């Protein structure tokens, strides 16, 4: 499964924000600020393409009236404020994986940017901030690529790290020389981070219509108006795609995709993806497109020796959720612990309505907070929960989890598996 995850194409749906000082700096000219940000995006895209990651700009916001947070010269404080604003405001308006704030302010000391290490796909921490510190947009783009690198699990390079001659992207200090490569250490950091955390949001390919930047033929991503995109003409080796026009060559039906073979659609019924487990199904081609549509077993089908029920292609059971939260020795707590879910507080509730925690009904207690026994030398408490004020939903019993024979959790209630949920 790890190898399958590593080999999969990754997509970072990026949202860029420019603050009020940026707007003033570029003469209150929205077009100038937008152009600056598009130019930056066009530098970031090929940098990450080498890492098997496509960066798609899915949103752009310019604070042309007033800042939506207090942008200040303390980078730490500004990053925290920006991340909170993203989590509470931006995410509810526009779905994206990562947000970066470009500011015209001077940060204290030599800092040109800051980003949370390993924050990608996290509601609170998938964010960075960068100072518009140079007239040369390449250098600012590299600073954003650097902060995104932190979000993707990369630490600063040590002296022994190498990417060729220049300092690499994750160098600890700013360079006035542009470097477009990640070091061997960064690539190792990133791979280890992916294996350990397997962030899911970056597996989802954005739609052509999600991308807000002008279409660029040669950036490896098929955008509105393009039929294919195999990169710049000098490097494209795709016999199906005309790299100069991003159109299919004469006679070609397709250029890429799991249901495309030698520029033709694969036949209807051809298997394009094997079943991953008992809740998945083998996926097949239609013969009419390159898409390999993901199919899975119906919700409610028993799985894992009748310990769970299939839900959206997975088999969520409490035992696995306790191990994920507390480590390999953890087990599910005794039934008595789940009675805390009837209290309707931080430690026990079934769902939230307008941010109010709703206590569980007696029959629903196993669809609220998950109670686990860590079974470790330092923790012998039989009733443990995982609670983080920054991500209150983490540590709740997952939707679709078996809560009784013939029943599964749906929206904090223990419902019959034969009803749609």
UniProtKB/Swiss-Prot annotation:
It holds the Pfam family ADAM_CR. Its cofactor is Zn(2+). Binds 1 zinc ion per subunit. GO terms for biological process: apoptotic process; proteolysis. The keyword Protease applies. Ca(2+) 2 binds at residues 280-281, 283, 294-295. Transmembrane segments: none annotated. It is an enzyme of class 3 (hydrolase). Disulfide bonds join 121-201, 161-185, 163-168, 217-246, 228-241, 230-236, 240-263, 254-260, 259-285, 272-292, 279-310, 303-315, 322-372, 337-383, 350-360, 367-409, 403-414. SMART domains: ACR, DISIN. Residues 214-299 form the Disintegrin domain. Glycans are attached at residue 29. One of its GO terms (molecular function) is toxin activity. Residues 10-206 form the Peptidase M12B domain. Ca(2+) 1 binds at residues 216, 219, 221, 223, 226, 229. The active site is at 147. Zn(2+) binds at residues 146, 150, 156. A motif (D/ECD-tripeptide) lies at residues 278-280. Homodimer; disulfide-linked. Belongs to the venom metalloproteinase (M12B) family. P-III subfamily. P-IIIc sub-subfamily. This is Zinc metalloproteinase-disintegrin-like crotastatin. It comes from Crotalus durissus terrificus (South American rattlesnake).
């Amino acid at each position: 499964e790890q190898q399958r995850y590593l080999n999969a194409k990754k997509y970072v749906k990026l949202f860029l924000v420019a603050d009020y000082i940026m707007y003033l700096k570029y003469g209150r000219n929205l077009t100038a600020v937008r152009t600056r940000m598009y130019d930056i995006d066009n530098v970031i895209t090929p940098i990450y393409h080498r890492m098997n990651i496509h960066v798609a700009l899915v949103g752009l916001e310019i604070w042309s009236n007033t800042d939506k947070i207090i942008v200040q010269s303390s980078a730490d404080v500004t990053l925290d404020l920006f991340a909170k604003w993203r989590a509470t405001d931006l995410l509810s308006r526009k779905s994206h994986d990562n947000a970066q704030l470009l500011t015209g302010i001077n940060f204290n000391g030599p800092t040109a940017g800051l980003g949370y290490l390993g924050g990608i796909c996290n509601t609170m921490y998938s964010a960075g901030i960068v100072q518009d510190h140079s007239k040369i947009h390449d250098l600012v783009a590299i600073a954003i690529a650097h902060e995104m690198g932190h979000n993707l699990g990369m630490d600063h390079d040590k002296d022994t790290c190498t990417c060729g001659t220049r300092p690499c992207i994750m160098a600890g200090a700013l360079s006035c020389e542009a470097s477009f490569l990640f070091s061997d250490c960064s690539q190792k950091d990133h791979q280890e981070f992916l294996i350990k955390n397997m962030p899911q949001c970056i597996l989802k390919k954005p739609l052509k219509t999600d991308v807000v930047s002008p279409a660029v033929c040669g950036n490896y991503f098929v955008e509105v108006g393009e039929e294919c995109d195999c990169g710049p003409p000098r490097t494209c080796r795709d016999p199906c795609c005309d790299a100069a026009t991003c159109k299919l060559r004469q006679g070609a039906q397709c250029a890429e995709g799991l249901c495309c073979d030698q520029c033709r659609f694969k036949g209807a019924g051809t298997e394009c993806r094997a079943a991953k487990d008992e809740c998945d199904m083998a996926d097949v081609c239609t013969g009419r497109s390159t898409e390999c549509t993901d199919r899975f077993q119906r919700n409610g089908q028993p799985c894992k020796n009748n310990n769970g029920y299939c839900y959206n292609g997975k088999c969520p059971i409490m035992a696995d959720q306790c191990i994920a939260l507390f480590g390999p020795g953890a087990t599910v707590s005794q039934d008595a612990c789940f009675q805390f879910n009837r209290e309707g507080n931080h430690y026990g509730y079934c769902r939230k309505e307008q941010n109010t925690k709703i206590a569980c009904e007696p029959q629903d207690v196993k669809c609220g907070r998950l109670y686990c026994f860590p079974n470790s030398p330092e923790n012998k408490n039989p009733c443990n929960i995982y609670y983080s004020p920054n991500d209150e939903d983490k540590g709740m019993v997952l939707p679709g989890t078996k809560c009784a024979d013939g029943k599964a959790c749906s929206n904090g209630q223990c419902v019959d598996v034969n009803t749609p949920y």
